[in-house]
From Swiss-Prot:
Entry-linked Gene3D superfamilies: 3.40.50.970, TPP-binding domain
Keyword Transferase assigned: yes
Catalytic activity: isochorismate + 2-oxoglutarate + H(+) = 5-enolpyruvoyl-6-hydroxy-2-succinyl-cyclohex-3-ene-1-carboxylate + CO2
Similarity comment: Belongs to the TPP enzyme family. MenD subfamily.
Pathway: Quinol/quinone metabolism; 1,4-dihydroxy-2-naphthoate biosynthesis; 1,4-dihydroxy-2-naphthoate from chorismate: step 2/7; Quinol/quinone metabolism; menaquinone biosynthesis
Subunit structure: Homodimer.
Class of enzymatic activity (EC top level): transferase
Record keywords, A-Z: Magnesium, Manganese, Menaquinone biosynthesis, Metal-binding, Thiamine pyrophosphate, Transferase
GO molecular function (one): magnesium ion binding
SUPFAM superfamilies: Thiamin diphosphate-binding fold (THDP-binding)
Pfam family, one: TPP_enzyme_M_2
Name this protein carries in UniProt: 2-succinyl-5-enolpyruvyl-6-hydroxy-3-cyclohexene-1-carboxylate synthase
Organism: Enterobacter sp. (strain 638)
Length: 556
């Protein structure tokens, strides 16, 4: 028997089984032990292949692909620390719901814990973070092919959200010509090879059902909190809230158009808190709220009823409100809970929001970080999308901007790490093929610098704005010890990104005024490929501007 040949037959069944569950994108890192999986993926015409030399970035690339495609994305890596590098993306997927299928090649059992090279204990390496985990045996014809496909089908069929880790040991030899070894074993699956259906089909049901007392509650005074959702859902929610006459507090990821902009500013005003305290019901649609004042209000509000609707299962309310946790897609839930036309009840809130917006506009004239966040709408590409980084960037955009309703916005706001942001944005662009604007801070860019290699393959104009405020200025908003802040929190690196862009053959601009930024953006959207635009700003101006506006709005 040819071991290398049967390894490939076994791997071919694995990859083919995944196609029956909607896997179309496969992300592959170089490696020897993963050869059977890599060759099987390469030979399967159902797949779109993506490659990257860094497994951590590869995992985030897959995450971005899954965000847009709404389908599971497979990742193939070799054994050893290559596997561990997938951990950050896996954790994020578990919190935000994207489906990742991690195919990790492994040494066979006899090479574990005996000093063999590149051999670590891979089963269970991700602890409780995967939604599902499989540790396959080494390939053998003693195990029916039907067992292999049914095992994979069961795991994929029960995967509602998050990652599936499939550990795949392969013995050597890994290379050699493909011969007839294992053909009969594969053929026992019969006409499964010609079909497009799983061997074992699972029925899944996701629907909370209509709340029977909705017709009662929709006549009450309500508030809508909009968290992370799709662009289409964001437009629906905005119309639904308008019909009900309820104030809508929209997060930057809600894509609702934020009809009451600057919520994270005006919620610091006592008048707003007093007005909203009259609410009898709060309905939160989507999780992962960003703004600090929004989260503070969410945690302290005391309505008669608090409903939280999200397709993700589990507890998603860190304030632990008494109420209802409803598992459903937001679109389906809105369809089951129609709005009734009513007059707006919180009449002071729109005026506070308008005053906060006007004040922000008046004070965001100079060239800077907070000012860019306020103006970001004018730099969005037509028929495009926005990817927002973490730390200070997302907070400024959430607090100071007003994005178009239904305009696609993506981010990694599950674990909210600064690792893998550029890689994720690259995946978002590849899956959508749309023009893409991504904005991150300088430390985030440094953390994922080799992901600039992925941007060379952008299929539409891609603009990466790096806001260089020389360190982690988010800590300027926190009561960190002044004497230790720079050394242990901000950690300024005093770098510029011109040579990084050149190393990866990306176009580069460093504008120093609004007119120069306008010209750079206009040029970038007219050209194919990726452009890195670096905004060098005064270190703490963005954080200070936010604090200044908060103080002013609180006294309106």
């Amino acid at each position: 028997m040819s071991v290398s040949s049967f390894n490939r037959r076994w791997a071919a069944v694995i990859l083919e089984a995944l196609t029956r569950h909607g896997v179309r994108h496969v992300c592959i890192a170089p490696g020897s032990r993963s050869t059977p999986l890599t060759l099987a993926a390469a030979e399967n015409r159902a797949f779109i292949h993506h490659t990257h030399f860094d497994e951590r970035g590869l995992g985030h690339l897959a995450l971005g692909l899954a965000k847009v495609s709404k389908a599971p994305v497979a990742v193939i890596v070799t054994s050893g620390t290559a596997v561990a590098n997938l951990y950050p993306a896996l954790i994020e997927a578990g919190l935000t719901g994207e489906k990742l299928v991690l195919l990790t090649a492994d040494r066979p059992p006899e090479l574990i814990d005996c000093g063999a090279n590149q051999a670590i204990r891979q089963p269970g390496i991700f602890a409780s973070h995967p939604a599902e985990a499989l540790s396959l045996p080494r390939p053998t014809q003693d195990i029916p092919a039907s067992w292999l496909v049914s095992t994979l089908d069961h795991a994929m069929g029960t995967l509602r959200h998050g990652a599936l880790h499939i550990n795949c040991p392969f013995a050597e030899p890994l290379y050699g010509e493909l011969n007839d070894t294992g053909v009969e074993w594969q053929q026992t699956l019969g006409d499964w090879w010609q079909s497009d259906k799983p061997w074992l089909r699972a029925q899944t049901h996701l629907q909370s059902g209509q709340q029977r007392d909705w017709f009662h509650w929709r006549q009450k005074r309500g508030v809508i909190l909009a968290g992370r959702m799709t662009a289409a859902e964001g437009k629906q929610v905005a119309e639904w809230a308008k019909t009900l006459g309820w104030p809508l507090i929209g997060d930057v990821l809600s894509q609702t158009g934020q009809p009451l902009p600057c919520a994270d500013l005006w919620l610091g005003n006592a008048k707003a808190v007093t007005e909203l305290a009259r609410a009898q019901i709060v309905i939160q649609l989507g999780s992962s709220l960003t703004g600090k004042r929004v989260l503070q209000w969410q945690s302290t509000c005391e309505p008669e009823e608090y409903w939280l609707v999200d397709s993700l299962e589990g507890r998603l309310d860190p304030a632990h409100h008494r109420g209802r946790r409803l598992v459903s897609t937001i679109g389906d839930w809105l369809e089951d809970h129609p709005a009734e036309k009513r007059q707006a009840w919180a009449t002071d809130i729109p005026e506070l929001s308008r005053l906060a917006w006007d004040l922000t506009t008046q004070q965001c004239e100079r060239f800077g970080e907070a000012e860019l966040a306020h103006r970001i709408r004018q730099y969005l590409p037509d028929q495009g999308q926005l990817f927002v980084g973490n730390s200070l960037v997302v907070r400024l955009i959430d607090a100071l901007s007003k994005l178009p309703a239904g305009y696609p916005v993506y981010s990694n706001r599950g674990a909210s790490g600064i690792d893998g942001l550029i890689s994720t944005a690259a995946g978002v662009q590849r899956a959508s093929t749309k023009p893409t604007l991504a904005i991150v801070g300088d430390l985030s860019a440094l953390y994922d610098l080799n992901a600039l290699a992925l941007l060379r393959q952008a299929s539409a104009p891609f603009v990466l704005i790096v806001v260089n405020n020389n360190g982690g200025q988010i800590f300027s908003l926190l009561p960190t010890p002044q004497s230790e802040r720079e050394r242990f929190y901000l950690m300024p690196q005093n770098v510029q990104f011109e040579h990084a862009a050149a190393m990866f053959s990306l176009k580069y601009h460093r504008p120093q005024s609004w007119s120069e930024l306008d010209d750079a953006m206009s040029t970038a959207w007219r050209q194919p490929g990726a452009t890195l635009i670096e905004l060098v700003v005064n270190d703490s101006d963005g954080a200070q501007k936010l604090q200044h506006l908060l103080a002013q709005v609180s006294h309106l």
